[in-house]
């Protein structure tokens, strides 16, 4: 009651892709709003300060742009903020080259994944200064922040699972074989919101349908 899930929390599948992610996210969000509008969440207490802090955080990219645009001396590149498209291009390059993208023939390994995590951490630092010139770009800015966090999660899980579980989707060049003895399991993670560090663990797979 009052818990809404999307993505792997409602059933893991390798074929969900981005379209499945945003579709399930939209469905979960609309269901949560309906839950609130129907007064089912009336026991949840939120202070005025919490609301104001949340609004300030959400609209910060608009402020970053308003201040930073005055420092532009030519073109559209600012020394004090990053635009959503600039951040997106960096994110795509990191995931493509270090986490088994098409230009790497879907191949990655321990060292590449660790370097990818380092570059993702740098990007997340820079996204604290993402700028948005209008509400559409504000949406893009937050979409980028969430995509970067999702990418970090994908990279952490790929590094933790020491095998190639999905040949064709990605390959661990240093762990090319399927290892059912050690890795016929689910991997779950918890992210510390204060430190950004992930804690990884294995969970058993329960087959509810016979393989035969």
What is each of the regions a protein language model found here?
Residues 1-212:
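Glycine- and aromatic-enriched mobile tails/lids
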């Amino acid at each position: 009651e009052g818990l809404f899930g999307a993505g792997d929390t409602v059933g893991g599948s390798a074929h969900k892709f981005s379209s499945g992610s945003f579709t399930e996210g939209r469905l979960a969000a609309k269901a949560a709003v309906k839950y609130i509008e129907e007064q089912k969440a009336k026991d949840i207490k939120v202070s005025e300060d919490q609301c104001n802090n949340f609004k300030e955080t959400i609209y910060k990219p608009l402020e970053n742009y308003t201040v930073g645009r005055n420092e532009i001396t030519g073109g559209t590149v600012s020394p004090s903020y990053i635009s959503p498209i600039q951040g997106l291009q960096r994110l795509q390059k990191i995931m493509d080259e270090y986490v088994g993208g098409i230009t790497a023939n879907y191949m990655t390994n321990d060292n590449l994944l660790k370097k990818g995590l380092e570059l993702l951490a740098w990007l997340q630092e820079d996204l604290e200064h993402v700028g948005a010139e209008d509400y559409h770009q504000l949406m893009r800015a937050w979409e980028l922040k969430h995509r970067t966090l999702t990418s970090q999660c994908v990279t952490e899980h790929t590094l933790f699972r020491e095998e190639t579980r999905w040949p064709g989707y990605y390959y661990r060049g240093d762990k090319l074989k399927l290892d059912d003895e050690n890795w016929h399991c689910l991997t779950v993670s918890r992210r510390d919101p204060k430190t950004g560090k992930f804690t990884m663990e294995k969970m058993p797979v329960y087959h509810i349908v016979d393989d035969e």
